[in-house]
Amino acid sequence: MAIESSEPMNCFINYGVLFLLTFALEVFGGSEDTQVLVYDARVGFLSAGTLEVNMTLSKGRYELFGDVRTSGAIERFFRWRGKFAAVGFMVEEMPRTRAYLLFEERKNSRKVTLAAHGKTTIHRLSGVSREVEYPQGSDLMSVLFLTDHCFDAAWVHDGEDAYEVVRTASRQTFVKQGKTHFRGSTELCRYRFNYGKAEQRGLDVWLGLHRDRWVPVRIRVRVPFRPDALLRLRTPG
């Protein structure tokens, strides 16, 4: 059951910094392997923005930071920016989230979601905050960017709600994405994303070898009756 509070929202930045100092920095101090991935986004035929992911793996632990922002033609319709951070452990080659932070900003609203210690706290610009039960599984961003193989099924969450992801097919393929994006052999993982009680989406992830690690080099989200969303990994030209 949600717990609501009328606490003022003047703690946005401090709350995020507290999270990073408490959880992420203890992993960063032992960093042995850090990688930065930059993706260009499209929705249908429209340029939609960029996603930057910074991830560090060290002795079975990980930290993940990301920045998503819209730009280009899509901003004629909407504008959105998000930052996320996650820390956790790798268990049987899959990430297990210990804590997850998401900051979202739209034209007239801001929202901070912090999932840690068995509960999720959600803050809004309106000054109303609430607590909900920690969702099942690991956060979607950790599973998406730190899993280097096609998995059969997993529960993922956005800090607030949990969703089941089930593999429907996989195969070897070769992708060509232009001179400035990844080109090469990949493994295509096709998933069914159970989003809500009756809604399903398609999630296609192409895994390719980039700087000695298998990472998503192309990601496509398929939503019925809507244009596909596509992410393509940038590579040096």
Pin down the residues of each PLM region:
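Acidic, serine/threonine-rich low-complexity disordered tracts
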Residues: 28-116, 151-237
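Bacterial N-terminal signal peptides that target proteins for export
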Residues: 6-16
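N-terminal signal peptide c-region/cleavage motif recognized by signal peptidases
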Residues: 24-26
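Hydrophobic, well-structured mid-protein blocks that either form specific transmembrane helices
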Residues: 107-148
